[in-house]
């Protein structure tokens, strides 16, 4: 099993009071694991309730229960525990 860690980054608000731009970083022994951790960090930085619902559901990267998600981007590179990924998205309530 891979070891994983996540870090949430930034807290910029967009022009609409109901939207936020978020980013998160994750590291894991695999790219898929690091992407998962990065998206978890985005959700945790946005809304712990949405994160909990996401964890109980299909756990699809780019989705957030209770939010419309757009501008999703994930970039990965070698680093950290094997792979390091950053996820970026705009989430609107």
Residue ranges of predicted features:
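C-terminal edge-of-domain segments
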Residues: 68-93
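Extended aliphatic helical segments
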Residues: 3, 20, 42, 69-74
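C-terminal alpha-helical interaction appendages
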Residues: 17-22, 77
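Sec/Tat signal peptide C-region and signal peptidase I cleavage site
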Residues: 10-17
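Bacterial N-terminal signal peptides
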Residues: 2-10
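Acidic-leaning, charged glycine-interspersed low-complexity segments
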Residues: 63-67
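Short, well-ordered alpha-helical segments
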Residues: 21-61
